[in-house]
């Protein structure tokens, strides 16, 4: 193994050039689960912690990083990433060990490992296996066509919600995932790359929430649909139908990705997409250092938000 020279840096400022280099590599790696809202919010989230290896040059360029978010007694590790030319040279083990030493002892470590890394992560720090994440990809036009025969509901763009309606959305989100994510949702919906819709029943009560956000490089024109929380399977399909129309109007040439977990009501949508003969790919396996019981109401989770800035499922 050739010797590699680098420096260690912890918790760089949100405006550091390292974050731009990190985002570019995340998008280039094709980690579509880590959408543009994740890469936009992570640098400035109060919960973000990070350890970096940087080059021993005046530029201090990106070599590698471990990035996690601390909240609700969990350290959710969203990124363990090395520049390609530094892989297999021992840098990863060094920054991993430093990161592990920085995490509170009373917190559970959680992460989603790509299939090739699951065994390694289980042996290192996270032996408890949780949900598996699969993704289904289709054209927006195909998505819209598959939904045209379904009925819709009274809906409203999240960007058009009144303050009272947004408060109701925060409560609905909390009921589903068992966490108060107000601060995160407020930041999430300020991003230009995010689009969201809620469905109301006849009493103007929220019965579904669905969102989309760009993922990967902008020129790839790919959107990740997440979350989809809904009161029932029929309402979930109504939300998908409504949202297909919104997406088709705004981004008719785009691709959409649905990352589904094998918990909650994810199996319902897995069956639906398989009926369309879409072959899924496994994005990752959820791993924890300790037992981590699910909170909230899993029956309403058709698509998890799957955002490491504030983990839901």
Swiss-Prot record:
Disulfide bonds: none annotated. PROSITE patterns: GNAT. It comes from the Eukaryota. GO terms for molecular function: acyltransferase activity, transferring groups other than amino-acyl groups. SUPFAM superfamilies: Acyl-CoA N-acyltransferases (Nat). Pfam families: Acetyltransf_1. To the C-terminal of C.elegans F21C10.9. This is Uncharacterized protein F36G3.2. It comes from Caenorhabditis elegans.
């Amino acid at each position: 193994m050739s010797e590699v020279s680098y420096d260690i840096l912890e918790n760089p400022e949100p405006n550091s050039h390292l974050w731009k280099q990190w985002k570019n590599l995340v998008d280039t790696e094709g980690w579509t689960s880590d959408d543009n809202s994740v890469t936009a919010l992570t640098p400035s989230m109060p919960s973000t912690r990070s350890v970096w290896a940087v080059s021993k040059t005046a530029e201090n360029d990106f070599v590698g990083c471990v990035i996690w978010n601390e909240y609700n007694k969990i350290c959710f590790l969203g990124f363990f990433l090395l520049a390609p030319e530094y892989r297999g040279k021992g840098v990863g083990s060094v920054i991993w060990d430093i990161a592990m030493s920085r995490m509170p002892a009373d917190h559970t470590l959680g992460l989603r490992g790509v299939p090739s890394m699951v065994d390694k992560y289980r042996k290192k720090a996270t032996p408890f296996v949780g949900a598996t994440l699969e993704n289904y990809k289709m054209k927006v036009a195909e998505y819209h066509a598959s939904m045209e025969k379904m009925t819709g509901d009274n809906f409203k763009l999240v960007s058009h919600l009144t303050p009272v309606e947004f408060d109701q959305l925060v409560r609905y989100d909390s009921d589903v995932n068992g966490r108060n994510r107000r601060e995160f949702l407020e930041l999430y919906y300020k991003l230009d790359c995010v689009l969201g819709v809620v469905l109301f029943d006849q009493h103007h009560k929220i019965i579904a929430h669905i969102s989309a956000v760009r993922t990967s490089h902008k020129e790839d024109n790919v959107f990740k649909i997440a979350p989809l929380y809904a009161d029932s399977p029929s309402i979930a399909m109504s939300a998908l139908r409504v949202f297909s129309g919104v997406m088709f109007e705004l981004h008719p040439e785009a691709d959409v990705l649905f990352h589904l977990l094998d918990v909650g009501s994810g199996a319902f949508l897995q069956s639906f997409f398989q009926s369309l003969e879409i072959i899924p790919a496994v994005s990752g396996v959820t791993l924890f250092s300790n037992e981590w019981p699910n909170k909230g109401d899993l029956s309403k989770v058709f698509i998890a938000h799957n955002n490491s800035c504030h983990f839901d499922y």
